[in-house]
Regions:
Chain B
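Noncatalytic modules at the cell exterior or secretory-pathway interfaces
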Residues: 65-67, 105-125
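Sec-dependent bacterial lipoprotein signal peptides
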Residues: 1-19
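Transition segment at domain starts
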Residues: 22-60
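Edge beta-strands of jelly-roll/beta-sandwich modules across compartments, strongly enriched
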Residues: 121-141
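Short, surface-exposed beta-strand/strand-loop-strand elements in extracellular ectodomains
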Residues: 77-93
Length: 489, 150
């Protein structure tokens, strides 16, 4: 997670737990059973032979190229036609003339508001990605579909000049959100289920991933009873829901006129094992964290959405999984009264998961970060259309250390830095440094309390205008519930 | 053997297409520029903009200290910038020409205001109206009032 005023401790609360925890999914998928057979392999999930003789037509899905193409086209035609019909939108009245202009005239950075560019566009890209992913293609073969979908929309789907920020956000954000939504919807589905449970699962999966929901209905998969493909289930899965209070202030001690109180609700899903799955297929391990907050001003209720998925990993030394060189793909969306930051990026570096025979397990990582596109709230750039942020590339890195007492609690500290030279917006540079410390304690494995203390410093240099430095702080106090119970074994 | 020639021809065609309309134009009769100025509003329209780079200014008497700008422009390529100065020359508004948007100026000194339009490689249509606003009107400049363009 590259940036802050988020909940990195919460985000990492389970980061190291996967090496400690085995979570039974037997109630979800009867054919998968995890067991800890010996101390040496206690953390390794084991797959028993399926106890179901049901066929598994979705275990080896066929590719449907032309269906995917048709869906990609529909994902462009439908929003265009909707805008054209319902609001007579001029930007939707594409023609040979507009296509010619878009192919020959310069691209322009657009001025949409933050949420539109940093959330809506990546979400649309996720649908492009899933046009391929849910038609039988794997991660790598689906990734170009986000790019092609975004490029064709920019060139042919609207009259506006193609925007480089849209192409980057839609393509990269679409891949990250798309694979995350594909896997979360897989987790929701259970092909063996019947009746109300089946309807609830299919509807939920369809809401999470509408392209997949459509395909399942059209192909009859939504009601076909069969085996759930084993790769729809991660080796471990962990979720948590936190609710509580947080206070921001543009001061070091949470006081002053800028102090702001919020009630927040956040959720996190940790999918797969960072120790054992990082080197497997892309996103076999990922984390997603989202938060809603009250009193969030013009930023809206969605104040945070962070996704980090493993792309590749290489063991360092002989011990499998304990020391790895890992590469992640990241999506960042933070929007609150103190800071707005959105980015698509990659981070990589060494990751250690140390499990001493006594005492807490230790997770340490030191990752460099490169963000092809990063958006950050500007002090001077403001357009009538609503854009109040600068665009640039993001470069930086950070480190974190986490101590985990199995079944009891976690304590961690994180520091992140990012440098953003402005490419579009008010000329200058931005630098942000964040640190946070925090911990949480659980009782009876399921219910817990937590606290985090976050500091943010930013140095914003503007050419020809007064520079702006910030020194902000945030405190979070919350109740937490873990699903399944934290530390279960 | 034909590949280099085909490549060269392709580059030539692409260059020709890319430069086909690089001519910088000023506003002309084809743009049917109209300014309708009255006591209760000013309306502006210039259409069929094709790579127009130009600067135009005119005056308008505003009896109130502020004004509302009703944006109805559609400039998919290039830019149009609207700068409004009050009776003593202070800038009370400086904004891009937008598509379906309402904004309000800062307060200024009533009297003869100047309106300046700056076009930069603009394609499409420039269209807006200005309406006087009394000082006590509730400001509307907030992101809630802004409409995303797509």
């Amino acid at each position: 997670m590259p940036l802050v005023l988020v909940s990195p401790v919460a985000a990492q609360a389970q980061r190291a737990t996967d090496s400690l925890v085995t979570i039974g999914l037997t109630t979800e998928a009867p054919h998968l059973r995890f067991s800890a057979s010996s101390p040496a392999t206690a953390a390794m999930p084991h797959f028993d032979e399926p106890d179901s003789l049901l066929p598994c037509p979705q275990c080896y899905p066929k590719t449907h190229f032309w269906v995917a193409v048709a869906e990609l086209v529909a994902l462009q035609v439908i929003p265009n036609a909707f805008s054209r019909i319902t609001s007579d939108a001029e930007w939707a009245k594409v023609s040979l003339n507009s296509w010619g202009n878009n192919l020959t005239l310069p691209w322009q950075w657009d001025n949409n508001n933050f949420k539109n560019n940093q959330f809506s566009h990546p979400y649309h890209g996720a649908m492009y990605f899933n046009a391929a992913r849910t038609n039988g293609y794997n991660f790598w073969k689906s990734a170009p579909w986000s790019f092609v979908g975004s490029l064709t929309w920019e060139l042919f789907g609207e009259v506006w000049a193609p925007a480089p920020n849209d192409l980057l956000n839609t393509t990269l954000g679409g891949i990250t959100l798309g694979e995350m939504l594909y896997r979360v919807s897989s987790l929701t589905l259970k092909n063996e289920s019947h009746g109300f449970e089946r309807v609830a699962r299919e509807v939920t999966a369809g809401l999470l991933n509408p392209v997949r929901g459509f395909n399942r209905v059209v192909r009859g998969e939504a009601w076909e009873v069969s085996r759930t493909p084993p790769d729809w289930r991660p080796s471990t899965v962990f979720g948590s829901v936190d609710a509580g209070y947080r206070r921001f202030s543009e001061s070091s001690n949470l006081s002053g006129a800028s102090a702001l109180d919020q009630v927040f609700l956040s959720a996190e899903l940790r999918y797969g094992s960072e120790t054992f799955d990082l080197g497997k297929r892309p996103f076999s391990f990922f984390q997603v964290q989202g938060a809603l907050a009250s009193n969030n001003g013009n930023a809206g209720r969605l104040t945070e959405l962070m996704v980090r998925g493993g792309l590749a990993a290489k063991p360092l030394g002989g011990d499998s999984g304990q020391r790895q060189l890992a590469l992640f793909m990241t999506y960042s969306y933070i929007n609150n009264p103190v800071i707005a930051f959105g980015a698509q990026g990659f981070s990589g570096g060494p990751v250690w998961n140390i499990q001493p025979s006594h005492g807490p397990s230790i997770h340490v990582e030191a990752l460099g970060t490169a963000m092809p596109i990063a958006a950050i709230r500007s002090d001077y750039y403001l357009t009538a259309e609503g854009r109040d942020y600068d665009y640039g590339i993001g470069l930086g890195g950070g480190g974190s250390a986490l101590l985990v007492w199995k079944g009891t609690g976690v304590f961690g500290a994180t520091a992140r830095y990012v440098f953003v030279p402005v490419i579009s917006g008010f000329p200058g540079t931005h630098q942000i440094l964040t640190t946070n410390v925090g911990g949480r304690v659980y009782w009876k494995g399921r219910l817990g309390i937590g606290a985090e203390w976050v500091r943010l410093w930013s140095w914003n240099i503007y050419y020809g205008r007064t520079n702006v430095n910030r020194n902000a702080s945030e405190l979070r106090l919350y109740l937490s519930t873990a699903v399944p119970r934290w530390g279960a074994s | 053997m034909m590949r280099p020639r085909a490549l060269a021809l392709g580059i030539l065609v692409a260059t020709a297409v890319g430069c086909a309309d690089s001519v910088i134009r000023e506003l002309g009769p084809g743009n049917a520029e109209t300014v309708v100025s009255g006591a209760d509003s000013l309306t502006y329209l210039a259409s069929n903009l094709e790579n127009v780079s130009d600067r135009v200014s005119f005056e308008w008497t505003n009896s109130e200290p502020r004004l509302q700008v009703n944006h109805q422009s559609f400039i998919p390529h290039g830019y149009g910038l609207l700068v409004i100065r009050d009776a003593v020359g202070a800038v009370v508004d400086s904004t891009l020409l937008e598509y379906q948007l309402e904004t309000e100026s800062r307060a200024g000194v009533p009297g003869v205001w100047s309106v300046t339009l700056i076009y930069a490689a603009a394609w499409g249509r420039a269209q807006f109206s200005l309406v006087p606003l009394p000082a006590d009107a509730v400001p509307e400049v907030s992101t809630d009032k802004r409409r995303a363009r797509r």
